[in-house]
Amino acid sequence: MIRTRFAPSPTGYLHIGGVRTALFSWAYARKNNGVFVLRIEDTDLERSTPESVKAILDGMHWVGLDYDEGPFYQTHRFDRYKEVIQQLLDSGHAYHCYCSKEELEAMRAEQEARGDKPRYDRRWRPEAGKTLPAIPEGVQPVVRFKTPLSGVVAWDDAVKGRIEISNEELDDLIIARPDGSPTYNFCVVVDDWDMRITHVIRGDDHVNNTPRQINILKALNAPLPVYGHLPMILNEDGQKMSKRRDAVSVVDYADKGILPEALLNYLARLGWGHGDDEFFSMEQFVEWFSLEAVSPSASRFNHEKFMWLNAQHIKAADNARLAELIAPRLAAAHVDTAHGPAIGDVLALVKERVQDLNALALEVDYFYKKREPAAADVEKHLAGDAVERMGRFADRLAALEAWTAESIHELFKPFCADEGIKMGQLGMPLRVLVCGTTQTPSVDAVLALIGKEEVLRRIRG
């Protein structure tokens, strides 16, 4: 059975690169009727926080990527890691190293002075016929993995193709710190082994970790998963996305009024494609997805295209759901939709005009309360006899028996003819008086929804 995993470190927010990794891992499992596992890699005790764990879990819930197993926490598995470390020590695949911090710094300085690549010189590595230094007093050793001294580590990456790295490029990795706590690269190996992960789909910043992890798996006689390393997501300037310059957190996008399905849809298109299809559901994505179709090249985040896609998802969204999503925004603006037109009817009229939920809430508010118009709009559209003219139009509105967009529309042409004005000289003042803005859908439809009594009240002040 196919088993994939998403394994974030809780040292900050859930960023969009992580969401795309989770999405591709989730989709591959769903496509193949497999299992998707969530693992929290929290061995960095100084940087991992409960707040970050919550942000990850909340983010996964918001985007709707459901997991079949987990969340598993590495900090709950320390006994298992110690057991496997001892197994490697007993089998001769790991050893204790008593180098002090000062020795390692001196070693690095000497190597850099010679122009060599800084690396541990394996002085504590046991070999046949080699005499090890005397164990110093007061030094707690680390445990290092015995990396093969020759040969290559090779794997067929599901995204990048064949990758080969010489063991001569690798040093003897520390797998346990002086206090006995296991290190990241080691925990990952044990977790993937124990959790029977068949496909490791992750960012290409992990490519250099892969040969080290493969060597450890081989030393444990454990099966090797298929590795697939996803390319980086760049910003529009072609630079790595950063929290300072770019909206990269899931929370950022939620606050900006993005629909989760729109974010997933767009992230799916960053590095993967299905012909010319831009707008699709997650059900379609799962049906179409394959690792072979993932590009090994980095992708640029195009904000304009992303917002266009969010607009398409808003248009396609159920109005009842949209009402739920914008309810907190309306409440914060003291807009009460319980009194006034049916919110579903309002959303049906305005949702094609916006690109995000924040803008949608702004489009909705004037149906329930008049905005204070901008001074420039008042000066431009309500100067001279415009207000008196609107009063005369209100009288005609008041005489209507049927309050519909059609009956309201039928008043426009004869009124403009009687007043000797153009339609813009009626429509714009109406918008400013009734809605407090010049930007609305068709004014007859807006007036029909707001209701006769409220429209007359707003016009007549």
UniProtKB/Swiss-Prot annotation:
InterPro entries: aa-tRNA-synth_I_cd-bd, aa-tRNA-synth_I_codon-bd_sub2, aa-tRNA-synth_I_CS, aa_tRNA-synth_I_cd-bd_sf, Glu-tRNA-ligase_bac/mito, Glu/Gln-tRNA-synth, Glu/Gln-tRNA-synth_Ib_cat-dom, GluQ/Sye. Disulfide bonds: none annotated. The keyword Transmembrane helix does not apply. This is Glutamate--tRNA ligase. Its EC number is 6.1.1.17. A motif ('KMSKS' region) lies at residues 240-244. Catalyzes the attachment of glutamate to tRNA(Glu) in a two-step reaction: glutamate is first activated by ATP to form Glu-AMP and then transferred to the acceptor end of tRNA(Glu). One of its GO terms (biological process) is glutamyl-tRNA aminoacylation. It is found in: Cytoplasm. GO terms for cellular component: cytosol. ATP binds at K243. GO terms for molecular function: ATP binding; glutamate-tRNA ligase activity; tRNA binding; zinc ion binding. Monomer. SUPFAM superfamilies: An anticodon-binding domain of class I aminoacyl-tRNA synthetases, Nucleotidylyl transferase. It catalyses: tRNA(Glu) + L-glutamate + ATP = L-glutamyl-tRNA(Glu) + AMP + diphosphate. The keyword Cytoplasm applies. Keywords: Aminoacyl-tRNA synthetase, ATP-binding, Cytoplasm, Ligase, Nucleotide-binding, Protein biosynthesis. The gene is gltX. Belongs to the class-I aminoacyl-tRNA synthetase family. Glutamate--tRNA ligase type 1 subfamily. A motif ('HIGH' region) lies at residues 8-18.
